[in-house]
Regions:
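Glycine-rich, aromatic-lined ligand/substrate-binding cores of catalytic
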Residues: 233-316
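N-terminal non-catalytic accessory region
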Residues: 1-164, 168-229, 239-240, 246-255, ...
Length: 382
């Protein structure tokens, strides 16, 4: 079935949710097998061949950010240039791996469904990839490009645009919408479809900064990737928010200390990662007041999947794998965090709709029939 006039649509990916490319001209390398210089850009994310033992040392060194406490900004190591390919196109968010291996399939199912309904890739459905290692305060050029693209798409389509965001992309979208005047939003945004949003932050990020997280890839040591994961400012930005979670909830337990949302400064000191607290202070205010977006919101979230909500560490804290305390959610985003969008009900004149997706895992919800059917309903509605 073809649509008469397509509602232009932008896909905003989440953390790790689009390709990154790198070009090297480094003064030194961490291992003799690492490339020191490349003639052109190559895929840094996602390239599974770079994530094998030994090669991962090179990957970590190229992927990491260096935080500058004076400028409150982060940058790549000397001789490493990172770029985000495919802004305004869909390929970079459809497949994270350019070889289109199924392991890296991301927005493909949604985009392909839209093509089947009469959409055209890179025309009335486009991707808005960004450097997801950073928080919005360091991606100002991205938001200017996003605003310009939305305006162009709306003018061409003859009506406002729908934004479909996943995971951390929802916080990016919220930040973006909070920066726009209401008149702009009324003119250019029809709906904001939110998939698997970590509105109140996620407990999982605590494990990432404390002991690293290999995402269940057995050949990768969590401690080996920890330095890179800590350096990504967006990781610290996604720690649980004090205005969303109970103040007395213990997220991290060691033989000597319990850490709640009010104890993050001490936590950063105890794991010897003082820069992390500075990053948190830089980024926590960006969306912490949870100002309503001022557009129609459709908040789809997974539930019924075991999701980490606290961690217990032995006396070897922080250099040891924790015992995981499980709760409800989508396997990544805690249910408590996902439903925070209900706080907007009645706080903006535009409708806020919540849809629970039982047994839906965080990334799998992008290929779920219910999700795709819901998107179709929104795009088809007048």
């Amino acid at each position: 079935m073809l649509l008469i006039a397509n509602v232009a649509t932008v896909a905003v990916p989440g953390d790790l949710g689009n390709q990154l490319e790198a070009k090297l001209d480094k003064p030194s390398v961490v291992h003799y097998i690492c490339y020191k210089k490349t003639d052109s850009f190559f895929t840094l994310w996602l390239n599974v061949e770079l994530l094998i033992p030994l090669a991962i040392d090179c990957w970590v060194d190229n992927m990491r950010l260096i935080y500058n406490r004076t400028t409150h900004s982060s940058s790549s190591p000397p001789g490493v240039e990172i770029r985000v390919p495919g802004f305004g196109r869909t390929y970079s968010v459809e497949y994270l791996d350019p070889s289109k291996r199924s392991v890296g399939m991301y927005f493909f199912n949604i985009v392909q469904a839209m093509v089947d309904w009469g959409y055209t890739r890179d025309d009335d459905v486009r991707g808005a990839p960004y450097d997801w290692r950073k928080a919005p305060n360091e991606n100002k050029e991205y938001f200017l490009a996003l605003q310009k693209m939305i305006e162009e798409m709306a003018h061409k389509a003859g009506g406002p645009v729908v934004i479909i965001a996943h995971s951390m992309g929802n916080l990016y979208t919220l930040y973006f919408l909070n920066q726009q005047p209401q008149a702009w939003k009324d003119r250019y945004i029809k709906d904001f479809i939110s998939l698997g949003a970590p509105w109140g932050g996620v407990a999982k990020t605590l494990r990432v900064i404390i002991s690293g997280d290999n995402n269940r890839i057995p050949v990768i040591s969590s401690l080996k990737v920890r330095s890179q994961q800590r350096s990504a400012v967006s990781t610290t930005w996604l720690l649980p928010y004090a205005n969303s979670w109970p103040k007395d909830k213990v997220f991290v337990q060691t033989p000597t200390t319990n850490y709640t949302v009010l104890d993050f400064k001490r936590l950063y000191t105890d794991i010897d990662f003082e820069d992390g607290w500075q990053m948190r202070q830089d980024t926590e205010p960006l969306v912490a007041d949870f100002t309503p977006p001022g557009v129609a919101v459709h908040c789809l979230y997974g539930s019924g999947v075991a999701t980490a909500e606290a961690y217990k560490y032995s006396e070897d804290f922080p250099d040891v794998e924790p015992t995981v305390v499980l709760g409800d959610g989508d396997g990544t985003v805690n249910l408590w965090s996902a439903v925070q969008c209900r706080r907007w009900v009645g706080r903006q004149k535009q409708p806020v709709t919540l849809l629970e997706l039982p047994a839906n895992e965080h990334v799998d919800m992008l290929v779920n029939y219910t999700t795709v059917a819901y998107i179709k309903k929104v795009l088809l509605s007048p």
